[in-house]
């Protein structure tokens, strides 16, 4: 325990040195520390001022706080879209709770609320996709088209038979790669014809981005984490999240330069060996 304010430079510096000492005892080369934004900013300043002392220290911003702040970004973008009224009138949340979760004040409730809205929109989107395939698509054979439509309908229907639902979902996943181009074409055409479809399709993309980031944190997927963070940064900038856009963007740029440096170094070594 360190008897001091967690946001003081001396406390942050002592914490970083203690972690380094622990890594030396364990004979590990690098030490990884995760902070929230307020402490992360001070830790990075210390590392920038003492680059040689903390060259083997990796400072990460906490994924929970990034996700929580991104929830507030989503709420700000779609604050007048009717999502709050939808959550209240459907009886899912009360007035005060719905208002707070859209401001990013509650992580679990916020993720659940956006998951529910996302699920409802995806069901409507798949129904519209099925109708579009029946009305306009002539590229698929009739038999194959009917199979795809029946699988979509099976997955949409509520069923207590878990085995049949898993079977239908598995068959649908097998055919999804072939449907992907058609679905992208459908979304493009529908977005051009309807601004409302384009608006809610953007909501689907943003919530899926949040879910990808959460999945990366839970699974420890570094590539998915980098991809999700890279797509999050423009939203932080657009919604005036100055500190998050600055420090998350800076961290991402440093990681990219590090990977480029490592690739160039490997190429130089292989060239010398040849």
Give residue ranges: language-model regions.
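Long, low-complexity intrinsically disordered regions enriched in Ser/Thr/Asp/Glu with frequent Gly/Pro
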Residues: 1-274
């Amino acid at each position: 325990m360190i008897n001091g304010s967690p946001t003081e430079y001396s406390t942050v510096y002592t914490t970083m040195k203690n972690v380094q000492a622990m890594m030396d005892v364990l004979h590990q080369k690098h030490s990884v520390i995760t902070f929230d934004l307020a402490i992360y900013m001070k830790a990075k300043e210390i590392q920038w001022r003492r680059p040689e002392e903390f060259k083997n220290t990796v400072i990460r911003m906490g994924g929970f706080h990034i996700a929580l702040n991104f929830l507030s970004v989503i709420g700000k973008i779609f604050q007048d879209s009717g999502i709050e009224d939808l959550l209240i009138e459907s009886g899912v949340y009360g007035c005060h709770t719905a208002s707070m979760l859209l401001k990013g004040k509650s992580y679990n409730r916020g993720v659940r609320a956006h998951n529910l809205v996302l699920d409802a929109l995806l069901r409507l989107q798949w129904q519209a996709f099925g109708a579009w395939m029946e009305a306009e698509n002539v590229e698929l054979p009739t038999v194959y088209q009917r199979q795809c439509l029946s699988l979509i309908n099976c997955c949409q229907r509520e069923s207590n038979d878990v085995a049949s639902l898993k079977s239908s979902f598995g068959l649908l996943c097998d055919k999804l790669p072939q449907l992907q181009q058609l679905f992208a074409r459908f979304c493009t055409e529908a977005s051009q014809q309807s601004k409302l479809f384009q608006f809610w399709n953007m909501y689907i993309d943003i919530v899926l981005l949040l879910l990808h980031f959460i999945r990366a944190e839970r699974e420890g997927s570094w590539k998915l984490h980098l991809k999700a963070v890279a797509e999050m940064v423009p939203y932080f900038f657009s919604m005036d999240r100055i500190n998050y856009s600055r420090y998350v963007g800076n961290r991402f740029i440093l990681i990219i330069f590090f990977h480029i440096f490592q690739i160039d170094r490997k190429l130089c070594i292989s060239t010398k060996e040849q």
